């Protein structure tokens, strides 16, 4: 409609013309098909085949008739017959239908590919509408308010920025949880003195990790675990293999970290309210984690020396007044439902954390 303004032909008018012209094929008068035909006409004229394929997949998912499987009843429904004809016209083969019909089993890689197409389309459409409103000099407070809320909702859900945990599954698949994962800290590919954390499908040895592409990698452990939690990749039933690398991480600490994330940020998150999106984002829930994957007394424990002292202040521990707070990881959920991860390290970690917060 916006692209045709001001000479807009409404779908209702096209529908009436078809009826008065005695074009009464019920399949073509179905509201979903009427909308699809209009979009197909528009995108085909512009040569935008990728966008058209996305529209076709959306329509196929909406109708929810799995054509790669036999019908449940004896007779095929009219929707199934219609989509058998449409998918033949689109050139979809059995393999593509089977992939789409297995959407409930899609995991991170397939969901990530579909998400990229959706994000590109939603972002393009929002920018187009914003430009359309500016060109027409729309001054309605309601229109500008709606566009503002929509823009912030898209920004909160899809905009990438430093420290923000990417949400990859906006309803594309019902469950991304993996049965078996391997968590490993390995030397970075471009700098052997740097270490990175990575999460892999299945049970892998340290040597095998180099032969497979990880689902996700990150410099810091908490950023990676927060991503796994936010996207439901790890759930209580997931079995984890750990290769701690240069860290002091063990199974007990890892399980406690995951449980802390579950308790602090239970899923699914409630949607951000319109009122929250009209205001600047603000912290709603904060989780602070101390010395993740680090033994602050490692130089003593390696020698089998265990310090005991009445001076238990972790910032001024024992007779040597040692600062045991070496790192702080902060996970913050804000009022726009953005999950943000920050890290501080060194003797001034606590002061830096308080100052930045």
Question: What residue spans do the PLM features occupy?
Answer:
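Nucleotidyltransferase catalytic cores
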Residues: 1-357
């Amino acid at each position: 409609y916006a692209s045709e303004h001001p000479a807009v032909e409404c779908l209702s008018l096209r529908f009436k013309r078809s009826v008065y012209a005695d074009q009464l094929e019920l399949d073509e008068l179905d509201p979903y098909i009427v909308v699809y035909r209009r979009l197909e006409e528009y995108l085909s004229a512009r040569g935008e085949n990728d966008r058209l394929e996305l529209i076709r997949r959306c329509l196929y998912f909406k109708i929810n008739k799995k054509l790669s499987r036999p019908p449940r009843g004896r007779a095929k429904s009219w929707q199934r017959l219609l989509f058998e004809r449409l998918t033949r016209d689109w050139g979809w083969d059995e393999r593509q239908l089977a992939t789409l019909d297995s959407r409930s089993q899609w995991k991170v890689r397939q969901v990530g590919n579909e998400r990229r197409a959706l994000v590109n389309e939603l972002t393009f459409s929002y920018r187009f509408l914003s430009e359309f409103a500016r060109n027409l000099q729309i001054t309605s407070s309601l229109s500008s308010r709606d566009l503002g809320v929509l823009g912030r909702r898209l920004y909160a859900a899809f905009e990438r920025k430093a420290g923000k945990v990417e949400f990859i599954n906006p309803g594309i698949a019902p469950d991304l949880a993996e049965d078996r994962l391997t968590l490993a800290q390995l030397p970075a590919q471009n700098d052997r003195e740097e270490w990175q954390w990575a999460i892999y499908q299945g049970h892998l040895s340290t040597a095998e990790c180099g032969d497979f592409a990880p689902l996700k990698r990150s410099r810091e452990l908490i950023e990676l675990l927060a991503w796994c939690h936010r996207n439901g990749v790890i759930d209580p039933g997931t079995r984890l293999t750990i290769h701690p690398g240069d860290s002091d991480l063990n199974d007990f600490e890892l399980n406690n970290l995951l449980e802390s994330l579950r308790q602090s940020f239970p899923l699914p998150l409630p949607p951000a309210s319109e009122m929250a999106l009209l205001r600047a984002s603000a912290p709603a829930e904060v989780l602070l984690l101390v010395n993740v994957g680090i033994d602050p007394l490692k130089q003593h424990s390696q020698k089998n020396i265990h310090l005991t002292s009445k001076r238990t202040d972790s910032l001024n521990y024992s007779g040597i007044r040692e600062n045991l707070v070496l790192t702080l990881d902060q996970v913050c959920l804000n009022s726009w439902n953005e999950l943000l991860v920050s890290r501080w390290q060194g003797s001034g970690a606590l002061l830096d954390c308080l100052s930045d917060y």
